[in-house]
């Protein structure tokens, strides 16, 4: 066997193997690599987009939280204002009611005072009439009259 012929055969076989690989094996491998490259690029773009969307979502979340805080503060301020108004209204109503009760009590006191005065006048006039009748029924005696007036003054006290 000739070494040159063997080398030439090997060269032809290598050329056929290279042609076969380039024609049938290499295109699917290149296609798979391109597909993987596209998928990796898409993944990287999606990751970048995800980071961007995450940053936007965090900013939006902070804005919503700030809006919620301001809304809560506004609601609390309104509730406080309303509570103060209710307290002021209740104070006003209570003062009006206290004034009415005071006026009613004053009127009742005046009415009771008038009643007691009238009753006292009636009692005094009855006692005076009794004293005068007692004085007129008996003879005029200074000592006796002094005793009667003393008893009369005792009955008044």
Swiss-Prot record:
Cellular location(s): Cell inner membrane
Alphabetical keyword list: ATP synthesis, Cell inner membrane, Cell membrane, CF(0), Hydrogen ion transport, Ion transport, Membrane, Transmembrane, Transmembrane helix, Transport
GO terms under cellular component: plasma membrane; proton-transporting ATP synthase complex
Cited InterPro entries: ATP_synth_B-like_membr_sf, ATP_synth_b/b'su_bac/chlpt, ATP_synth_F0_bsu_bac, ATP_synthase_B_chain
Record NCBIfam families: ATP_synt_b, PRK05759.1-2
Protein purpose: F(1)F(0) ATP synthase produces ATP from ADP in the presence of a proton or sodium gradient. F-type ATPases consist of two structural domains, F(1) containing the extramembraneous catalytic core and F(0) containing the membrane proton channel, linked together by a central stalk and a peripheral stalk. During catalysis, ATP synthesis in the catalytic domain of F(1) is coupled via a rotary mechanism of the central stalk subunits to proton translocation. Component of the F(0) channel, it forms part of the peripheral stalk, linking F(1) to F(0).
Protein name as annotated: ATP synthase subunit b
Organism: Vesicomyosocius okutanii subsp. Calyptogena okutanii (strain HA)
Gene designation per UniProt: atpF
